[in-house]
């Protein structure tokens, strides 16, 4: 526990002392190779390298019109490269992370200038620690095959597809789509007309109003027997005849829009634009629309730019406020150009005509989250029981806050961490928090008070926040009972508590479920493991001095009920079968383990069921158990950690990074005796 306090205190002070520091998410990759100074944001003299890419979706390829932009000779990880690839898939083809997970295949191929290539699976989520030099990349090909569900195939068999063409003002569209009907379905001309109008609106943007104002609007139904029928879309008159969908060969839709003289004044001017976000550019596939009023000022133009940034790339006004760069360049047809800052409030009185604009390029380079986000460590004491500083309050955006804002944050963590809601606080005997400032002063605030404060505080001036709650009688809806777990004679200290309801009397069946739950979450012991265990029991110690031993393997429970408030503590004891002394000896494996480079603070001897065949998950479970037993770092603590990874070194010279917060589905096995050492890195 001393080590755990040392880690958390050191890291908490480190976070406060370095507000605005940029933590690299790819520290694992950076550890593998020396840092490339050319990629530093402080080195402004770098040049750019453009890597062309192509996207193929379901066999249909897109021309190489755009490039990924990197700093020249920059060393990047495969994780960073995958993020870039996913970004262009989303912006160019509308393929999201969910689409990739559900796809039949999703991969990209990196072609290097030395003739080699590397294929990366976009669905794997596993990255090597190797770095790539951007100047060595020749091109990138992205290939995605979307998954077609079995249900869709059944629908295809049951559905009947009718090809259609659309001709608007003499311009025809190729037969790329079909109208879908049920096979041998009898439909009316009214239903058919509704389908035709629907595709006119979705494919060509022609509404009912446009059809009424058009010179001509009709569609021709071509039947398989050689006959055809022409229907006027403007008439609104339908015959009572029904058509069998399987008799239709094709449908030709023809619309001539009426051009009134007054429509000349309502011309819709389209200006193409592109967005470059953090060096990744999108194709010019969209336009800014200027209708009715082609003359516009730069203030309105800036508003339109911000709107497309929000719509196309999810960049809000808040993101722009903290961006390193945020500007757009207006290129005119006469060869001139004008650069305008998106965060500026100063606009010229000049007007610009949309027809004079050739294109608009939008450039945004977002700032690091560390500059926008600030973290303040906090502790919670409920009825005198305090928690260590393992978490921080996160303040995003404005560096100044009021006590009203802090109170909202405090209420949120009380609800999340300790299950204390607004109602419990209302009836609490005491509900306060103390703000400790770096200058040595402090201020105590009542959580239940309505604070109206004119002066704002700077988050960076706050050292820590201590929350203190003493619940009243109405707030005591739950009891927290301390427990210990002993597996094969090895016990853990009392770090956690069982949360048991006080609202009603409980049974041993209810208590059994609670005990099994913590065995599963804390030590990875499932119901099946308990069934085959040599011994599985727990002892309930009551405050009146009595105790009750309960067999976890039995499904027979006494009908007695009791109150959780009468329980003093619970000791859980599980003994598992071992194969033989000979096997046990060979399954005991020793290798050094460090935590944040500290040695000999956790056990270096581990017992595996079969040391000759273990997986990464098996190793992770053993390391978590050792940290819980020796240092009191539980699975819950790891889940709240900012970073929890370990690097396993093998005797053959290879190594692998593993995230302790993730459950791996890698079924590849290896020998425990092949492990040379393990380095664990924790950041709270």
UniProtKB/Swiss-Prot annotation:
Keywords: Cell membrane, Membrane, Repeat, Signal
Entry annotated with the keyword Iron: no
The MAP repeat ranges on this chain: 45-154, 156-265, 266-374, 375-474, 475-584, 586-684
Gene3D superfamilies: 3.10.20.120
GO cellular component: plasma membrane
Membrane topology annotation: Peripheral membrane protein
Coarse class of the protein's main subcellular location: membrane
Signal peptide coordinates: 1-30
Domain of life the protein comes from: Bacteria
Location of the protein in the cell: Cell membrane
Function comment: Binds various plasma and ECM-proteins.
Descriptive protein name: 77 kDa membrane protein
Species per Swiss-Prot/TrEMBL record: Staphylococcus aureus (strain COL)
